[in-house]
A protein has these predicted regions:
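Exported/periplasmic ABC-transporter solute-binding proteins
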Residues: 30-78, 85-88, 92-270
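Sec/Tat signal peptide C-region and signal peptidase I cleavage site
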Residues: 24-30
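N-terminal secretory signal peptides that target proteins for export/translocation
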Residues: 1-7
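Bacterial N-terminal signal peptides
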Residues: 10-23
Length: 270
């Protein structure tokens, strides 16, 4: 009897030891968070994501494109955890379809709209009512813009040109791009003499210079909302909280973004 008890205790001890070693030897799997973000956020959000990954050990995968294209992909079932739009319209679009976590939605960033030229260009313009934009393009030059009917930067740009009374003159000279970074590239490569992008895009590209900034009252306020998607993994909340916290703010400010309602942002959890 005593022998059996000793043997049973020994086997239990062996089992518990194996279980403990097995558990200890299994690495904790890092969470992977998927973000769909407006193309204009690339430099700033990449920097914020790197800082978060270094701190958390999690992996952040970011897909950059036009807000319109990303919203349509999410509507079509593309797997993502967070949507970061360059305007309110496309966030509203997903909200109306019950595809975002409404309680998480925050309008986080602001931006400016600028007219750019290649770095070596000598063009000089004052952006005002009736300014000679079409003349500045020359006989066959194009104006680079993101898609004026769908992409936020293009919509802001078209609205500004209409307000300033020059859209009709320049409409046929617009070279439309799939997103604002593609429009930026047209100008950086010298393919177009002028383009309309965000101030942050111009700051990120050394091959262009700012000719002028569009008046704030010439277009809707440029605002960037961010939200968790309704289907987001629970692990995505940590990165979301980091992005909207003061801890991440310097990454956005360094690229020229304005932090909206800065004082109300929560501090990221340690």
């Amino acid at each position: 009897m005593a022998t059996r008890l000793i043997r049973r205790s020994f086997l239990q001890l062996v089992f518990l030891t194996i279980l403990a070693v097995s558990s200890f030897g299994t690495p904790v799997r890092a969470a992977e968070v998927t973000v769909f973000a407006a193309a204009s956020l690339k430099n700033a959000l990449d920097d914020a994501a790197k800082a978060y990954e270094a701190k958390s050990g999690d992996k952040v995968v970011i897909s950059y494109a036009a807000s319109s294209a990303l919203a349509k992909q999410i509507e079509g079932g593309a797997p993502a955890d967070i949507f970061f739009s360059a305007d309110l319209d496309w966030m509203d679009y997903l909200q109306q379809k019950n595809l975002i976590d409404v309680g998480s939605r925050k309008t986080l960033l602001g931006n400016t709209l600028v007219l750019i030229a290649p770095k070596g260009s000598t063009v000089s313009l004052t952006i005002e009512k009736g300014f000679p934009l079409v003349q500045a393009l020359g006989s066959d030059g194009k104006l680079a813009m993101a898609d004026v009917n769908a992409v936020p930067a293009g919509k802001y740009g078209k609205a500004a040109l209409i307000y300033l009374g020059v859209w009709d003159a320049v409409a046929s000279r617009v070279a439309q791009a799939e997103n604002v970074r593609a429009a930026l590239a047209f100008v950086a490569r010298g393919e177009t003499p002028l383009g309309i992008v965000y101030g942050t895009d111009a700051k990120a590209e050394p091959a262009v210079r700012v000719v002028g900034t569009f008046p704030e009252d010439s277009h809707l306020k440029i605002e960037y909302p961010v939200a968790l998607l309704a289907s987001a993994k629970p692990e995505a909340r940590k990165f979301f909280d980091f992005v909207v916290s003061p801890t991440a703010a310097p990454a956005f400010e360094a690229q020229g973004f304005t932090i909206l309602s800065k004082s109300s942002l929560p501090q990221a959890a340690e």
